[in-house]
Amino acid sequence: MNKHVALGMTGFSLIAVTYGMARFSWGIMLPDIRQAIPFTPEVAGIIAACSYVAYSLSVFLASFLTDRFGPRLPAVLAGISAAIGLVILALAYSPLILATGLFIAGLSSGLASPSLAAAVSKRISAERQTQVNTLINAGTSGGIILSVLVLRVMSGNWRLACIVFAVMALFCLFAVLRTLLRERAEQLRSPPRWRVVLAKSGMFRLLVIAFVSGVASAAWWSFGPELLQRHTGLDSAITHMLWLVSGGAGIAAVFTGSAAKRIGMRGVYCCSLLFMAVSLVSLALSHGFAWWLFPVAALNGAGYVILSGVLLVRGAALAEPSPAAGVSLAFLMLAVGQIVGSVAFGQLYGAIGAAGALVFFSGLSGGLLFISPEGER
């Protein structure tokens, strides 16, 4: 197996575990968790925000560890924190324990992305980096698909599913240890100065986009299944199917690099925002099952994963020769936005209802069409 394939598949697997299972499986498990451990939508938003707070902290740590010790250490820590957090979730009996487990699991995704971006920058030729990065980023969808399938097989037993996810995280460590080799001291460099990275042309604009994108995306990724069941009135079987479609559609992010060659990265970026905006408005207007909910779910899944791929590629490019720092900053602001979005959507949901909250969050995605990560109008 050549290094492009080995690194791509290892990264895909690690992202699947840390994002799809340790982070985004919360959304699909939320309705069942609320039946076992009752709490309000406002509390649900606060618990979901814990994952993003953890992400915000670990993404800085990942950049430091990557530059000081190489990509291997933070990648290994990502798998370990995912496993520990998922086990705590499986054993939880109160909202506080749920928040603790989700926080520890949330550390994993922040550790994973910058380390993998740095590994790609060091080991993959420049002309192949966008394709490998977007392949790795699509692991989010792979993890979501697998998490839905596991939950279906286990008839919604979310505690047992969390244990299965934790075991998968530990298995992923073997691939990480084999593919990401320990680096020699002379290959490492001192951590970048954040002021230097922030001063890079176009970086501030990218961070604004990442923040607002995070706010807008929280509606679906923190409350999607809850909305499908309580707002739209679907049963758990259809909800799981729609979540599976949403995750599966995100696999389209694998083709981000190829699409960018045809319509440009700005075109890819605009499409991703339109996907997210249209899907949220459609969900706001839906009551009861309709066939068009399947493309709605697909649009949201594809839109978010493609958009995060744009942020990853652009952040890494702007921050050269310290791509991990650029990815860390972009994904940090994405996570900060998701913290704000999770809490804000929970409050709006409780105050004005799901429809009004969804329309408002859709407008955030639409507004970003007027700001390009490349500075074009």
Regions found by a protein language model. Name each.
Residues 101-138:
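Cytoplasmic helix-loop-helix junction between adjacent transmembrane helices
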Residues 318-354, 361:
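A late C-terminal transmembrane helix in Major Facilitator Superfamily
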Residues 58-70, 252-265, 349:
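Helix-to-loop junctions at the C-terminal end of transmembrane segments
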